[in-house]
UniProtKB/Swiss-Prot annotation:
Enzyme Commission number(s): 1.14.-.-
Source lineage: Bacteria, Bacillati, Actinomycetota, Actinomycetes, Kitasatosporales
Enzyme class: oxidoreductase
Record's keyword annotation contains Lipid metabolism: no
Database matches in Pfam families: p450
Keywords: Heme, Iron, Metal-binding, Monooxygenase, Oxidoreductase
Signal sequence range: none
Protein name: Cytochrome P450-SU2
Organism, as annotated: Streptomyces griseolus
Annotated family: Belongs to the cytochrome P450 family.
């Protein structure tokens, strides 16, 4: 039996772990308890194999910042959270599941598109889109589903503009994204959705070769360094991550503010707090809730435990972002907190490339909703809100609101 195949102790917690009923904004209680009592512990994965669970802020940063922990999904023992996840990553890995130098080479092709200066220049256009969506949502109505009318369309429109993807195809790519991110999707369902999305993007790349524009896919084609499949794989990452994460953060942030009226009132009274409040919401909600996977390439001491070469690791950024040593009172939402040390976007060389764009989108989305909808409220009881515990990216499936 190899190191990677060792089973966890019988009492080891299972991942993905479930949140407690009635506590939709808190990490899974098993993960929280591990962070308190055994910060580096063994866990059981869906297929019965085991990995290490790293739960404290200091240790999570240590793993994610150490090149001895590989992001290469092709290494034996890499900890996949689901069978479908293994299908996605194992057959067409993005640069997020590669190590340097190949990771750095591919990432550099996109860096200029997501630097703060360029993203800030997009702020007026993102604001225009946000206001247009609110106009459409509120015209002749007093209620709507925030997810379908605002939270999902806004980042979808923005990422389509950046990539050069026709927005009229949004239903197609949003549905394939849903399948890819559903934890219960079978490998066959994932393979079909992935193949359809990759073929769509490869076909788009071929179109850009004939009719170029100034968007990302067209520029990747013009570089001549990648074939259509590689461009499609890179486009898939940007398209799925570029709309799903911000959409769910927008909806979940709105809900948690409505559930914390004192914090909502403070933001309304002090709009200048919105920029910092976005960092606090990213910390508090941590929608990448099932962990960031790595695999050790040599024996490494983390949190007093030796993680052996070939053993998988899940970095639980949800519990790291509640670490009381870094964020005192971290189980409470405080929109005035300095939350800049959060790891919601990861840490190290693989941290989220699109975080400057996500910040701008979230700042504009929250400020616009608070400004345009002074009587914003839930249209159904909180208990009826359907949470996305079944998805790799946490959030809500719908959010009925009224104004």
């Amino acid at each position: 039996m190899t190191t990677a195949e060792r089973t966890a102790p019988p009492d080891a917690l299972t991942v993905p772990a479930s949140r407690a009923p009635g506590c939709p904004f808190d990490p899974a209680p098993d993960v929280t308890e591990a962070a308190r009592t055994e910060p580096v512990t063994r866990a059981t994965l869906w297929d019965g194999s085991s990995c290490w669970l790293v739960t404290r802020h200091q240790d999570v940063r240590a793993v994610l910042g150490d090149p001895r922990f590989s992001a290469d999904a092709h290494r034996t023992g890499f900890p996949f959270l689901t069978a479908g996840g293994r299908e996605i990553i194992g057959t067409n890995p993005t640069f997020l599941r590669m190590d340097d130098p190949e990771h750095a080479r591919l990432r550099r092709m996109l860096t200029a598109d997501f630097i703060v200066k360029k993203v800030e220049a997009m702020r007026p256009e993102v604001q225009r889109l946000a206001d247009d969506l609110v106009d459409r949502m509120t015209t002749g109505r007093t209620s709507a589903d925030l997810v379908t009318e605002f939270a999902l369309p806004l980042p979808s429109l923005v990422i389509c503009l950046l990539l050069g993807v026709p927005y009229e195809d949004h239903a197609f790519f949003q549905e394939r994204s849903r399948v890819l991110l559903t934890l219960r999707s079978t490998p066959e369902e994932v393979r079909a959705a992935q193949d359809e999305l990759l073929e769509y993007l490869a076909r788009l790349a071929r179109t850009k070769r004939e009719r170029p524009d100034d968007a990302i896919i067209s520029r990747l084609v013009a570089r001549g360094e990648l074939d259509d499949t590689q461009i499609a794989t890179m486009g898939r990452l940007l398209l799925v991550a570029g709309h799903e994460t911000t959409a769910n953060m927008t909806a979940l942030s709105t809900l948690v503010l409505l559930r914390n009226p004192d914090q909502l009132a403070r933001l309304r009274a002090e709009p200048a707090l919105v920029k910092g409040a976005v960092e606090e919401l990213l910390r508090y909600l941590t929608i990448v809730h099932n962990g960031v996977p790595r695999i050790a390439t040599e024996d490494v001491l983390i949190g007093g435990r030796t993680i052996a070469a070939g053993e998988g690791v899940l970095c639980m950024i949800s519990s790291a972002n509640r670490d009381a040593e870094v964020f005192p009172g971290g189980d409470d939402l405080d929109v005035a907190r300095d939350a800049r040390r959060h790891v919601a976007f990861g840490f190290g060389v693989h941290q989220c490339l699109g975080q400057p764009l996500a910040r701008v989108e979230l700042q504009i989305a929250i400020e616009t909703l608070l400004r345009r909808l002074p009587d914003l409220r839930l249209a159904v009881p909180h208990e009826e809100i359907p949470f996305r515990g079944d998805m790799a990216i946490y959030g809500v499936h719908s959010l009925p609101i009224a104004w």
